[in-house]
Amino acid sequence: MGQKVNPTGFRLGIIRDWTSRWYDDSPVISEKIKQDHIIRNYVLARLKKERAGIARINIERTTKHVKINIYAARPGAVVGRKGEEINNLSQELSRIIGKEVKIDVVEVIKPEIEAQLIGENIAYQLENRVSFRRAMKQAIQQAMRAGAEGVRIRCAGRLGGAEIARAEQYKEGKIPLHTIRANVDYASVTAHTIAGTIGIKVWVYKGEVLVQRIDAIEEDEMKKMKDRRNDGGAKGRDSRDNRSKRRSRSKRS
């Protein structure tokens, strides 16, 4: 089943977090989901010319404002000169959704192992008539040099302008899709070429992360147990003191 399911959705709530973090139980929840979709599409279209290398966009909501975290390989292209670009973008989004928008830009330290950026880079090369084999092999080599433990790239469509569509893939290292503790980054990108559209799928294995999560959970549980014991000890001492006071009062009477 791990071969078919989306690796990101398969790991949500365990080692991966949601890109939209907010809660609402009102009937207008569908409108907010639609707004998130509009925000992401607008930001990507707005910054496409600058080639900022946007890996992902996280959205958080409060009652008063909407906070957007943009993870970019080139944060300077998002911010602009003296913050002009990011201010204009926040104002435009505020007009669209009718709420105050706050934007934070986070730099992606290793863009070579971000699946979304790898897919976009391959799509850009295919649209500029670069050989698909060369683009795929170069992307895999760069990712493995940057520290990835495994990479798999699959391209499907009229590759090289062929009349009959086909699919080809290249792989290096290991990609444990069934292992939930495996941090597998996944992205799907479409390249619009003269011959037609080419679908690009990228899997990047960055190592296991659940061991650290288990340790953190165990530490939290130990702290809670200690707090309970301390609270129980304090309550026990208080009850013993109260009993001794009652006994002394009864003896005096």
Swiss-Prot record:
Residues 243-253 have a biased composition (Basic residues). Residues 220-253 are annotated as: Disordered. GO terms for cellular component: cytosolic small ribosomal subunit. SMART domains: KH. One of its GO terms (molecular function) is rRNA binding. CDD domains: KH-II_30S_S3. Keywords: Ribonucleoprotein, Ribosomal protein, RNA-binding, rRNA-binding. The keyword Ribonucleoprotein applies. The keyword RNA-binding applies. Residues 221-242 have a biased composition (Basic and acidic residues). Residues 39-109 form the KH type-2 domain. One of its GO terms (biological process) is translation. It holds the Pfam family KH_2. Binds the lower part of the 30S subunit head. Binds mRNA in the 70S ribosome, positioning it for translation. Part of the 30S ribosomal subunit. Forms a tight complex with proteins S10 and S14. Belongs to the universal ribosomal protein uS3 family. This is Small ribosomal subunit protein uS3. The gene is rpsC.
